[in-house]
């Protein structure tokens, strides 16, 4: 089981204040599918436990995992499954303003403390929303590729997602309708000689004239359940340093 161990510091998880959501990002619904293909960037607030305190004792250190978190009721997370397949149960439900639908599953970067080694009962500390970008059912009319800053790309351990760590440039505009957006489209499908297919995807980014005063971190996940094991996924990303491509092989779920 792989975890990232982090020390809690003031301001570790902060909101992206100037970015707002046009409508709530759909969770994985009861049917088990993400419903949204194009996501508008929002105030990516990290839900945080109010009674968690900073300091240098053992509770200052926490684990961080990308998860599918389940809401018991609106704005409250009850349990989660990590990308490593570990089941986590929160001692107390984690209040989470962006998890707006009851009995639904959300993608998140979860910070938590384990009660004791070998136990799946944990204290939820905070949950940062991860944007889920699913391929649209049909070609979108607008496919902007405004540049952004690329940090990392990796396949989830369970093979369910390709994940991207990005930095977007943001700034206050004073206009409510100035919202950035991220999305993904598929440009080509190529049949390979060995029977597999190569899917070329393109990351979309609409800056929408939002001022580029400073950077803020955003994580996105692209579900792999629509592809066959062995297929190749190429993702083209337009960055401030020029275009780049990251390649992944789909693994069995």
Language-model regions: role of each:
Residues 1-28:
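N-terminal secretory signal peptides that target proteins for export/translocation
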Residues 43-46:
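C-terminal motif of bacterial Sec signal peptides marking the signal peptidase cleavage site
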Residues 204-233:
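Short, solvent-exposed, Trp/other aromatic-anchored flexible loops in extracytoplasmic proteins
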């Amino acid at each position: 089981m792989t975890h990232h161990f982090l020390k809690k510091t003031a301001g570790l998880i902060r909101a992206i204040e100037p970015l707002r959501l046009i409508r709530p990002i759909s969770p994985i619904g009861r049917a088990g599918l993400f419903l949204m293909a194009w996501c508008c960037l929002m105030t990516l607030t990290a839900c945080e436990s109010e009674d968690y305190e900073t300091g240098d004792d053992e509770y200052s250190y926490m684990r961080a995992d990308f998860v599918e978190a389940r809401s018991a009721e609106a704005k409250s997370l009850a349990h989660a499954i990590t990308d490593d397949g570990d089941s986590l149960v929160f001692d107390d439900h984690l209040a989470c303003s962006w998890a707006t639908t009851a009995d639904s599953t959300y993608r998140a970067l979860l910070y938590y403390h384990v009660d004791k080694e070998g136990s799946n009962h944990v204290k939820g500390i905070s949950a940062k929303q991860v944007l889920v970008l699913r391929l649209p059912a049909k070609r979108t009319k607008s496919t902007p590729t405004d540049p952004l800053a690329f940090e990392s790309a990796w396949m989830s351990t369970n093979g369910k997602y390709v994940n991207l760590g990005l930095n977007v440039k943001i700034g206050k505009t004073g206009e409510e309708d100035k919202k950035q957006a991220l999305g993904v489209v598929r440009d080509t499908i190529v049949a390979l000689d060995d029977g597999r297919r190569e899917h070329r995807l393109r990351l979309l980014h609409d800056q929408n004239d939002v001022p580029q005063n400073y950077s803020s971190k955003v994580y996105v996940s692209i579900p792999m359940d629509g592809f066959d094991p062995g297929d190749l996924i190429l993702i083209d990303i337009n960055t401030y340093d020029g275009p780049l491509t990251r390649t992944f092989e789909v693994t069995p779920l």
